[in-house]
């Protein structure tokens, strides 16, 4: 999907509520610095100072819209950034520009960092000749999941399930609580009805076969080494060709190609949201017609 079209996925009401909570967190009371800047009309240039993928425009826009400011973008969502790049301009009352500055930069930097990591992972997978799905996980920051899942999509990865209601995931603790793989999958199938798929986390070929026999749609081979993963997936697919196989656990950008194989359908990576470094952006007010280019430290 075109990155610019992904903004349609974001519910306006949810987006507005998130932005409101972020701004209230940063300034719940008196804003003394507003007396320094004043309320005169001002303009600021948004600069990208590190390479990566630009992501998070809808959040950036929503923050400044709530503060009666206008954003003009010079690069589309999903663009590859080559520093130093002038990405956008923001216009509005000075105290409003500065009130939204840090919240907007934090959101854009984090979202772009995740999109950049996702894009690198997809590129590594395609470079290995693999055409399956690179996906994120539910290992996201509480209260910030919408931004992080959106960043995955801009980077070309799959978001995986958004929340507990998107897929019935039977994990190891569910198996223990239910009293075995078969009982757990049976209960999951009954709960899922015809609307949801059931995925089962497995730590051995035996568990994977039990899960598939019990009716799992997807089998998650968790924390398998590559030399164990591919033989297990081969045997499983031979017996259950319609069952999708997901690999997860300990997968990084460096070792990702080792997990790519003809019997692996999905590779999920927690590091895409947990370890992706934020990109470096700055927002600089300027008085002249041409904004000065910031230095990279």
Curated annotation (Swiss-Prot):
Pfam families: QRPTase_C, QRPTase_N. It catalyses: nicotinate beta-D-ribonucleotide + CO2 + diphosphate = quinolinate + 5-phospho-alpha-D-ribose 1-diphosphate + 2 H(+). Changing residue 102 to A/Q: Reduced activity. Residues 8-12 are annotated as: Important for hexamer formation. InterPro entries: Aldolase_TIM, NadC, NadC/ModD, Nicotinate_pribotase-like_C, Quinolinate_PRibosylTase_N_sf, Quinolinate_PRibosylTrfase_C, Quinolinate_PRibosylTrfase_N. Quinolinate binds at residues 102, 138-139, 160-161, 171, 201, 222, 248-250, 270. It is an enzyme of class 2 (transferase). GO terms for cellular component: catalytic complex; cytoplasm; cytosol; extracellular exosome. Changing residue 138 to Q: Loss of activity. One of its GO terms (biological process) is NAD biosynthetic process. Pathway: Cofactor biosynthesis; NAD(+) biosynthesis; nicotinate D-ribonucleotide from quinolinate: step 1/1. Keywords: Glycosyltransferase, Pyridine nucleotide biosynthesis, Transferase. Activity toward QA is slightly repressed by phosphoribosylpyrophosphate (PRPP) in both a competitive and a non-competitive manner. Competitively inhibited by phthalic acid (PHT). It comes from the Eukaryota. Its EC number is 2.4.2.19. Changing residue 161 to A: Reduced activity. GO terms for molecular function: identical protein binding; nicotinate-nucleotide diphosphorylase (carboxylating) activity. Belongs to the NadC/ModD family. NCBIfam families: nadC. Involved in the catabolism of quinolinic acid (QA). This is Nicotinate-nucleotide pyrophosphorylase [carboxylating]. The gene is QPRT.
